[in-house]
Amino acid sequence: MKTQFAILLVALVLFQMFAQSDAILGKIWEGIKSLFGKRGLSDLDGLDELFDGEISKADRDFLRELMR
């Protein structure tokens, strides 16, 4: 009975690993397809708005408080 339970647990863990890796690999593949798709490279201009190179005084004060 203990052996059967151990085999069941190992099988469940392996099944979970397979199911989760399949989902992760699927999302990675969708990202690659959208990046190199017909309009994928022209849509990268929207990413420029996400990066703000300037750090405000409030951000610096917050970082100083964090480092204390």
UniProtKB/Swiss-Prot annotation:
| Site, Important for antibacterial activity, and hemolysis activity: residue positions | 29
Gene Ontology CC: one annotated term: membrane
Q: Does the keyword Membrane apply?
A: yes
The protein depicted here goes by the name Cytotoxic linear peptide IsCT
The protein's PTM annotation reads: IsCTf is an enzymatic proteolytic cleavage product of IsCT by the proteases present in the venom.
- Keywords attached to this entry: Amidation, Antibiotic, Antimicrobial, Cleavage on pair of basic residues, Cytolysis, Ion transport, Membrane, Secreted, Signal, Target cell membrane, Target membrane, Toxin, Transmembrane, Transport
Can you name the source organism? Opisthacanthus madagascariensis (Scorpion)
The record's similarity note reads:
Belongs to the non-disulfide-bridged peptide (NDBP) superfamily. Short antimicrobial peptide (group 4) family.
What Gene Ontology terms describe what this protein does at the molecular function level? toxin activity
Query: Which interval of the chain is the signal sequence?
Result: 1-23
Per the UniProt entry, the propeptide covers 40-68
